[in-house]
Swiss-Prot record:
Name assigned to this protein: Carbamoyl phosphate synthase large chain
UniProt-annotated stretches for the region Carbamoyl phosphate synthetic domain: 552-962
SUPFAM superfamilies: Carbamoyl phosphate synthetase, large subunit connection domain (SSF48108), Glutathione synthetase ATP-binding domain-like (SSF56059), Methylglyoxal synthase-like (SSF52335), PreATP-grasp domain (SSF52440)
Region annotation (Allosteric domain) ranges: 963-1136
Binding-site positions, ATP 2: R717, K765, L767, E772, G797, V798, H799, S800, Q840, E852
Residues that, per the record, bind Mg(2+) 3: Q840, E852
Organismal lineage: Bacteria, Bacillati, Actinomycetota, Actinomycetes, Bifidobacteriales
Binding site for Mn(2+) 2: E299, N301
Length: 1136
């Protein structure tokens, strides 16, 4: 069937901010969709609140709205743009739920907008638990015994019938949010209560526990002629009980018989037909009992999912692209396979290699969080590897995770019998360390049966782990490392670093092993991903390495640039860095062959048709050097870009240069100059720039001396970190001692000598009550171009990645902006930057302080680019390749005059707000972890509010980050520290004028009473040990109080807004319980007075309900017009 001709314009809804369970994979799928629609001549209207996405680039759609994905805003855009159809299946659960809400509100009918990709009925049958159970039954398959509940009373009744353990699964949520496994009534109430809250339909499915069963997934696609293909089967190494996003997964499947696999196919095809997905794809999850073979259907997603992105990258079959074509009316047999260009999409992909995905976690960012892996997803990113066998693929994937333990470790002494027993007990509870525990137990003598009984991991995988250990022991014990043994080690997935450790070769061991390997002529070869197990020739150069005989690399003629990506998403290094890499690829591809190296299956950069060559490889020194050596033989290489992918590639710069690899842009020496505190301090002194007083320390004594010289409070952090890892504000000697002792315990044991750390701690004076500013800039060696000046809405002390900020700045004077510009130019020259740089400043009492400079792309580059209409990363890539800023003005990449530091009258305002994952992380007794923000970054994503002035833009940013946005009336709870009480009366008067009733603790209420402001008194909470069930919360009744504390009032739904500024040690104060309860109830809460002043302005804007919706294409034209007028006015003034 040919494409439908009645669809002229389509609205695509994105997935919004990066959150756990819904990450960069939807930027990948959304970008694919937009490209397909435009290629087909369809006008594209895109809505997404996340500026750090390629899909929100102006060239991806005809009209791009970086606005909240809420029904009122979406209706405004639909009314303005009048699309023929809405495509919601490529924006995750957010887009699907938004489409359902638009349908229920009558908006789709009112404006005659057709839903394509999936009907409302199909969405309901796939997402609603009860409806889906019926579909499964009609398909002749089995679900786990279960029942639906909407209240805790109904939950208890089901528990009485089924007994424990029970699985709770909410309807219409993603990433298993609100789900969990309950082993008793208390756990059941906690999990089910959260599930009912997070489900938009207040519905949970309670099902019998099937922990320990084997788990599989199928990715399927179906067209309107009822053709169905199974794109990829995926096997979870972890058994049922661990969310598939937190499990190691592999393709193809290894532990199914052909008969079992065919049974899963038959069930999957019957279900996709029964649900009614007839123009797109879906993901179905199954469980199989390891002994009886009983098959249970767990759930399905009637949309492109996280697993779809993994399956696409694993097979080379672009699911999102094909789903979009199916939504336009094509059938599978009419769509060409891009990789072979000779087979249709109705040919099911076949793979002759092994794909392994390993999750990346960030528990270290959330002290007190329960590290147990359950049915609610907790990983923040993932890495994928391809190789010739499972062992090699697993080894590559584990070192791609980029953590301190790069895969399995056999360091130290062989575990004793007692330690093995302890390890077997520990691995019964799944955590991120389970596989390291398994390998250590095997090394210590555990049997396969013991490992299986403790983990329920399939015996086939356990046997693979035993084989890896056996190879490691051969390497460890051999007198000499023969070529044959070294090759065997490589086929077992062991890196040069691991082999060096096994051989006890010390610091230079990796280089020693590499030299030996190269002397033996042992190099990996590079194979092509072709979708068909080499049955047809692949036209797309999409490569992976393995230790085999024949390489499939082809010669090239053009000079090449290698761009190193950022690896798996993690807090502090996320999608923003992939955005800059993709821009570099797009721009440099005009003049060079672009070679992308990355290992993240979620990203746009690992789309096989984004770069000229794609290497799906770990970002380690060994793997990158092998790619460089292989590519050098295929054609000329201009150099490698390490500046755009964050700290991971940046940390390789010096070693790559030492190995003879040319580095483009800022040199490794200049990178070290900016990162080294003493050297950078000298640059600042020469340029007469202020910095907070600082010192460095390798021991507790040195740290104490530095802190006393500087004066408390101080900011303490390790050197060379991203995302404020390990950063803390310290107020006294006791807190400092705790910090240093923790740093010593976390350092590798063999690097700590006599209580001294291997690398110094940095200790800075903490600037209280200062305004913090981020500046992104380009420098070509002569000229500076300011990309954007972003003023933080919170005062200094909150990590820049977590802080809300505004562009243009809202309170800085022209003189302050001039001083920022001059300081940035001086630092760029002093650090010899070439390309992008980011400098963080603070104004305290109008004195400018330099906090730090980063000679690389920062996480604010996408936001600054969208707010100013300038593709900063594209211009930076050309500057790194040797061009000038003047050339970028001439070719249209940069503004022809002026830059992002100029503030124009009438300019639209952009506000960036962070999105935090706290509702995912709970303590072992079920409380959410503390949300109090500080110098260590904890956000996973961001949103952008964009409107005519700051109040409206900030209000949009809150609407995009809080479900429902800011309240316009109701009850506001206030509890502020003594320092903030002087500002409080003005805030309180405004709240009363806006129609709020104030509820406050006794101390705050008495301050308000002195100013004639009435408030309801709420009991205070005293929590001795928040996470200890032996010490429950005690309540102290205040005179004249309502008789309840604020936590009870929040749980009863009586509080609509919270202002809670903690004291200097906030995280252990009463505030913790308040903040934890507010997260669970999804109530907007603010912990600084400066941000709350912005909230008051925003509430006024919300009450007016006169938001503007402006596409970024319109905004860009407006900015250029403002710049032109400004230039003309300047020329006229000079002429006079």
């Amino acid at each position: 069937m040919p494409k439908r001709t009645d669809i002229k314009s389509v609205m695509v809804i994105g997935s919004g901010p990066i959150v756990i369970g819904q990450a960069a994979e939807f930027d990948y799928s959304g970008t694919q969709a937009c490209r397909v629609l435009r290629e087909e001549g369809v006008r594209v209207i895109l809505v997404n609140s996340n500026p750090a996405t390629i899909m929100t680039d102006p060239e991806m759609a005809d009209a791009t709205y970086i606005d909240p994905i809420s029904t009122p805003i979406l209706e405004k855009i639909i009314a303005k743009e009048r699309p023929d159809a809405l495509l919601p299946t490529l924006g995750g659960q957010t887009a699907l739920n938004a489409a359902v809400a638009l349908g229920e509100a009558g908006v789709l009918k009112k404006y005659n907008v057709e839903l394509i990709g999936a009907s409302l009925e199909a969405i309901d049958r796939g997402e609603d638990r009860e409806s889906f159970k019926k579909v499964v039954k009609e398909a002749g398959a089995e679900s786990a015994r279960s029942d639906i509940a909407h209240t805790l009373e109904e939950v208890d009744a089901i528990a009485e019938r089924f007994g424990f353990p029970l699985v709770v699964r909410p309807s219409f949520t993603m990433g298993g949010l609100g789900s969990g496994i309950a082993h008793d009534t208390e756990e059941l109430h906690r999990i089910a209560g959260a599930g009912i809250h997070y489900s938009p339909t207040d519905e949970v499915l309670i099902e019998e526990g099937i922990e320990g069963w084997k788990e599989y997934e199928l990715e399927l696609m179906r067209d309107r002629n009822d053709n169905v293909v199974v794109v990829c089967p995926i096997e979870n190494v972890d058994p049922v009980g661990v969310h598939t996003g937190d499990s190691i997964t592999v393709a193809p499947v290894f532990t199914l018989t052909d008969r079992e696999y065919q049974k899963l196919r038959d069930i999957g095809i019957a279900i996709i037909r029964g649900v009614g997905v007839d123009t797109g794809g879906c993901n179905i999850q199954f469980a199989i009992h390891p002994d009886t073979g009983r098959i249970i259907v767990i759930e399905m997603n009637p949309r492109v999912s996280r697993s779809s992105a993994l399956a696409s990258k694993a097979t080379g079959f672009p699911i999102a692209k094909i789903a979009t074509k199916l939504a336009l009316g094509y059938t599978l047999d009419e769509i060409q396979n891009d990789i072979t260009r000779s087979t249709p999409a109705s040919f099911e992909p076949t793979i002759d290699y092994v794909v392994t995905k390993v999750p990346r976690f960030a528990f270290e960012k959330f002290p007190g969080a329960d590290p147990t892996l359950t049915t609610s997803m907790k990983s923040v990113g993932e890495a994928m590897a391809l190789a010739g066998n499972f062992q090699e693929s697993l080894g590559k994937a584990m070192r791609s995770i980029d953590k301190r333990h790069m895969g399995f470790s056999w360091d130290g002494e062989k575990p004793s019998e007692g330690e093995v027993h302890e390890l077997l007990e520990q691995m019964r509870i799944p955590t991120e360390h389970r596989y390291l525990q398994v390998m250590r137990a095997i090394w210590g003598g555990a049997t396969p049966e013991q490992i299986f009984n403790a983990t329920k991991i399939d015996p086939w995988f356990i046997d693979q782990f035993f084989q890896i250990n056996a190879t490691a022991m051969q390497v460890r014990g051999a007198e000499t490392l023969s070529k044959r043994l070294l090759r065997k080690a490589k086929l077992a997935g062991l890196s040069d670093v691991q082999i060096a450790h096994l051989r006890r070769l010390g610091d230079e061991g990796e280089n020693t092993i590499r030299e030996l390997r190269w002397n033996y002529g042992l190099h990996p070869v590079f194979k092509t991903v072709d979708t068909c197990a080499a049955e047809f020739a692949a036209q797309t150069p999409y490569y992976y390495s393995c230790y085999a005989d024949e390489t499939e690399l082809r010669k090239r003629e053009r000079e090449a640039v290698i761009i190193l990506g950022s690896g798996p998403n993690r807090i502090g290094q996320g999608i923003e860095f992939d955005y800059t890499c993709v821009h570099a690829v797009q721009e440099l591809g005009k003049d060079y062959d672009t070679i992308m190296v990355n290992c993240n299956p979620e990203t746009v950069s690992t789309d096989y048709d984004m770069s000229d060559r794609l290497y799906f490889e770990p970002l380690t020194f060994e793997d990158v050097l092998e790619i460089y050596e292989a590519e050098k033989k295929q054609g000329p290489i201009k150099g490698v870009i390490v500046q755009l992918g964050g700290q991971t590639p940046l940390s390789l710069a010096a070693r790559l240069k030492a190995a003879g690899v040319p580095i483009l842009g800022t040199t490794p020496e200049a990178i070290d100059l900016a990162e080294n505190r003493e050297l950078f301090g000298e640059v600042l002194r020469q340029e007469h720039l202020n910095a907070p007083r600082f010192g460095t320390a390798l021991s507790l004594e040195e740290a104490r001396e530095a802190a006393h010289n500087i004066g408390y409070p101080v900011l303490v952090r390790p050197s060379y970190v991203l995302g404020g890892r390990g950063m803390e504000i310290v107020y006294d000697d006791a807190q400092l001692e705790t910090y240093v002792n923790r740093a010593l315990s976390e350092a590798k044991a063999d690097t700590v000598v006599s209580g001294r750390l291997p690398s110094p701690l940095l200790i800075d004076k903490f600037l209280q009550d200062a305004i913090e500013i981020d500046v992104d800039a380009l420098f070509d060696g002569e000229e500076l171009y300011i990309g954007g000046i972003m003023e933080h809405i919170e005062e200094a002390g909150v990590h820049s990645g977590d802080a809300a900020c505004t562009l243009p700045p809202s309170t800085l004077s022209d003189d302050q902006i001039r001083r920022l510009r001059e300081a940035t130019l001086a630092i760029a020259k002093g650090c010899q930057v070439r390309g992008l740089m980011n400098v963080q400043y603070a104004f305290m009492a109008n004195t400018l302080y330099v906090i730090e400079a980063n000679p690389r792309a920062s996480r604010t580059v996408p936001f600054a680019s969208k707010a100013t209409g300038v593709a900063l990363a594209k211009a930076a890539a050309r500057i790194m390749a040797g061009e000038t800023i003047e050339q970028q003005r001439e070719n249209g990449l940069l503004l022809p005059y002026g830059d992002g530091g100029d503030v124009r009258l009438g300019q639209q305002v952009a506000v960036k707000e962070s999105v935090l994952p706290f509702k995912r992380f709970r303590t072992p007794v079920g409380k959410t972890v503390d949300i109090l923000l500080g110098p260590e970054m904890r956000s996973t994503g961001e949103v952008m509010g964009f409107d005519r002035d700051f109040p409206h833009a900030f209000a949009k940013s809150q609407l995009a980050s809080y479900e429902g946005g800011l309240p316009t009336n109701g009850n506001v709870f206030i509890s502020v520290n003594d320092t903030d009480k002087r500002q409080l009366p003005l805030f309180a008067v405004r709240l009363v004028e806006l129609g709020f009733e104030i509820w406050a603790t006794e101390g705050t209420a008495s301050v308000l009473r002195r100013y004639g402001i009435e408030s309801k008194i709420v009991d205070k909470i005293h929590s001795r040990v928040d996470t200890d069930p032996e010490h429950p919360i005690e309540i102290q009744h205040a005179a004249g109080s309502v008789g309840k504390n604020v936590v009870e009032l929040i749980e009863e739904g009586q509080i609509d807004l919270i202002l809670n500024t903690p004291n200097s040690r906030g995280s252990r104060s009463d505030g913790y319980s308040i903040r934890a309860a507010a997260i669970a109830a999804d109530i907007p809460q603010y912990t600084t007075m400066t941000e709350f002043s912005a909230v008051l302005l925003a509430i006024e804007a919300v009450k007016k309900n006169d938001y503007e919706v402006m596409s970024i294409q319109e905004h860009s034209r407006e900015l250029y017009e403002l710049e032109r007028k400004h230039k003309e006015e300047g020329e006229e003034a000079r002429a006079q």
